[in-house]
């Protein structure tokens, strides 16, 4: 993939969240603020495109051009109903 495009990982999961990481090209990465997480408006402003619900949840200090995202895994409808 060209170095001048935003790259998106496949999604990966645990029991509470789905995750993905986004790799920013160098010209975009230099625009990100240091030492804090980005709001949805900020990462969308950088050109990151994802569906609703994703949150920038952690900094990867060795590689600050990699943004780490997660969102809650929706509960299956069957587990929402209470059957006594």
From Swiss-Prot:
One of its GO terms (molecular function) is cyclin-dependent protein serine/threonine kinase regulator activity. The keyword Cell division applies. PROSITE patterns: CKS_1, CKS_2. The keyword DNA-binding does not apply. One of its GO terms (biological process) is cell division. Keywords: Cell cycle, Cell division. It comes from the Eukaryota. SUPFAM superfamilies: Cell cycle regulatory proteins. Binds to the catalytic subunit of the cyclin dependent kinases and is essential for their biological function. Monomer in solution; may form a homohexamer that can probably bind six kinase subunits. PANTHER family: CYCLIN-DEPENDENT KINASES REGULATORY SUBUNIT/60S RIBOSOME SUBUNIT BIOGENESIS PROTEIN NIP7 (PTHR23415). Belongs to the CKS family. This is Probable cyclin-dependent kinases regulatory subunit. It comes from Physarum polycephalum.
């Amino acid at each position: 993939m060209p170095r001048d495009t935003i790259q998106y990982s496949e999604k990966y999961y645990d029991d509470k969240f789905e995750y993905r990481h986004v790799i920013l090209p160098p010209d975009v990465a230099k625009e990100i603020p240091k030492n804090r997480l980005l709001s949805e408006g900020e990462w969308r402003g950088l050109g990151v495109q994802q569906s609703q619900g994703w949150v920038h949840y952690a900094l990867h200090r060795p590689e600050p051009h990699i943004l780490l995202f997660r969102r809650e895994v929706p509960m299956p409808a069957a587990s929402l109903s209470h059957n006594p």
